[in-house]
C-alpha cells in the first residue's frame, strides 16, 4: 500500500500512522521561497529532503513500512512513538500564540465581568471566588468538543458564550479567564503541548488542550479539564505570551476510610471470610484489573498517584483473626504496594497503600508496574480469614 500526501498550509499537525500497515508514504510541504518554515518529523528516523524549483521550496519525507497503529489499551496520550509531522509558517511559536492571544482579547465582554462580580460579591476569600466561578461554568455551561482548527481559531464574544450556555474549549477557557480577572483573581490562558514537541517550531494546530492559571493568595493554581500537575512532565505548558511555565509535578492523593462488620452468621464450618470492599476512586476506577501479561508498546498511567485506604473491621464476639499480621511490602524502583494489619482492641485496622511515581513505562518495565497494579486490584489481597 502506498500513500502520498501534499500539504499546503501554514499550520500542520498530522499523525502518519493508520489502523493498517502502510508500505510507503510520501509527505511533502510546499511553500514559496523566502517563506519561513519550521517543521519536524517525530517518532521516525527519516530525514527531510529539501528541494527548490520555480520559486517553490519543497520539503518531503518518504516513510516506508509503517506498522499499523497499536490497539493496546493505555497507550501514551501524546503517542510519542508514532510518526508525527508538525510544521508551521509562523515566524515562531511565540508569534503563533500571539495571534490567538489577540483574538481572545478581542472577545472580552462587559456582561460576563459584571456577572462574575455579582456571583462573588459575598465571597469571603479568593479561593471561594475561584470555586464559585469554576463551579458555575462547570455546572451551567456545556462544552462543544470542536477542535480549534475546525473553527478557524475564532472566538465568539464571551457575553454570547455566557448567555448561550455553551462554548468550545477555547471559549470556555477564555470565559473562565475573564470572569476570574473580573473577580480580582489574576488569571491567564495557557496552551498545553505534547512534551516531546519543539514548541518554538509549532503553530496553533499542535496545541493539545488549554488551561487557565489563576493566582490565588499568592499561589498559582491550574484549572483545566484534567489536572496538569499529575502528568509527570509529559506535557509542555506555555503562556500566550510565549513564556514556558514550569509546573511542579504532584501525584493524585487519595485517602479514604471504610468500616466493615462481620457477623457470626457469615461463618461456615467454623470459619468466616471477610472481603474488604474496593473504593470507587483511584486505581480501582482505571479499569486495569485484567492487564495483558506482555506488551509491545509504551504503557501510560492516567496519572501519578498515592492512594491509602484504611479499613476498620469489627468481627463478631469470639472470632479470631487467622490471616497473618506481618506487614507486606512489594517495592519497585518507581513505586510500592503495602499492607498492614493491626489488632486494636475489639477491632482490626487494615491499611493498604500504593504509590506510583512514574507515569510512562517501556515494554521492559511493564511487567514490574503490572505486578504492582495487580497486587492492588486483585480481590484476593483484600481477604481476611477468621475462625469462630
Language-model region placement:
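A sensor for short, sequence-defined functional sites
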Residues: 1-4, 8-388
Amino acid at each position: 500500500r502506498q500513500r502520498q500526501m501534499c500539504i499546503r498550509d501554514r499550520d500542520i499537525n498530522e499523525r502518519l500512522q493508520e489502523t493498517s500497515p502502510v508500505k510507503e508514504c510520501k509527505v511533502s510541504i510546499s511553500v514559496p521561497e523566502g517563506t519561513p518554515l519550521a517543521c519536524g518529523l517525530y517518532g521516525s528516523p527519516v530525514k527531510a529532503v529539501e528541494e527548490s524549483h520555480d520559486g517553490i521550496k519543497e520539503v518531503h519525507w518518504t516513510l516506508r513500512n509503517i506498522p499499523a497503529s497499536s490497539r493496546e489499551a493505555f497507550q501514551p496520550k501524546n503517542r510519542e512513538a508514532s510518526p508525527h509531522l508538525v510544521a508551521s509558517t509562523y515566524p515562531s511559536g511565540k508569534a503563533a500564540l500571539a495571534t490567538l492571544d489577540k483574538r481572545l482579547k478581542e472577545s472580552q465582554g462587559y456582561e460576563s465581568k459584571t456577572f462574575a462580580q455579582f456571583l462573588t460579591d459575598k465571597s469571603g476569600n479568593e479561593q471561594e471566588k475561584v470555586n464559585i466561578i469554576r463551579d458555575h461554568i462547570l455546572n451551567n455551561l456545556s462544552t462543544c468538543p470542536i477542535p480549534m482548527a475546525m473553527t478557524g481559531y475564532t472566538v465568539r464574544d464571551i457575553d454570547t458564550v455566557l448567555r448561550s450556555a455553551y462554548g468550545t474549549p477555547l471559549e470556555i477557557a477564555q470565559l473562565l479567564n475573564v470572569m476570574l480577572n473580573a473577580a480580582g483573581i489574576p488569571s491567564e490562558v495557557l496552551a498545553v503541548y505534547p512534551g516531546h514537541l519543539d514548541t518554538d517550531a509549532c503553530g496553533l494546530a499542535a496545541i493539545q488542550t488549554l488551561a487557565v492559571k489563576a493566582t490565588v493568595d499568592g499561589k498559582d493554581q491550574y484549572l483545566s479539564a484534567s489536572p496538569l500537575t499529575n502528568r509527570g512532565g509529559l506535557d509542555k505548558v506555555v503562556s500566550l505570551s510565549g513564556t514556558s511555565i514550569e509546573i511542579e509535578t504532584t501525584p493524585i492523593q487519595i485517602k479514604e476510610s471504610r468500616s466493615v462488620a462481620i457477623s457470626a452468621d457469615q461463618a461456615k464450618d467454623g470459619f468466616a471470610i471477610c472481603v474488604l470492599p474496593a473504593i470507587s476512586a483511584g486505581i480501582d476506577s482505571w479499569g486495569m484489573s485484567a492487564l495483558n501479561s506482555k506488551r509491545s508498546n509504551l504503557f501510560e498511567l492516567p496519572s501519578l498517584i498515592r492512594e491509602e485506604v484504611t479499613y476498620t473491621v469489627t468481627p463478631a464476639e469470639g472470632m479470631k483473626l487467622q490471616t497473618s499480621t506481618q506487614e507486606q511490602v512489594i517495592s519497585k524502583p518507581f513505586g510500592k504496594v503495602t499492607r498492614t494489619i493491626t489488632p486494636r482492641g475489639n477491632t482490626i485496622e487494615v491499611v493498604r497503600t500504593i504509590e506510583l511515581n512514574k507515569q510512562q513505562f517501556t515494554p521492559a518495565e511493564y511487567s514490574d508496574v503490572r505486578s504492582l497494579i495487580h497486587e492492588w486490584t486483585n480481590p484476593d489481597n483484600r481477604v481476611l480469614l477468621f475462625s469462630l
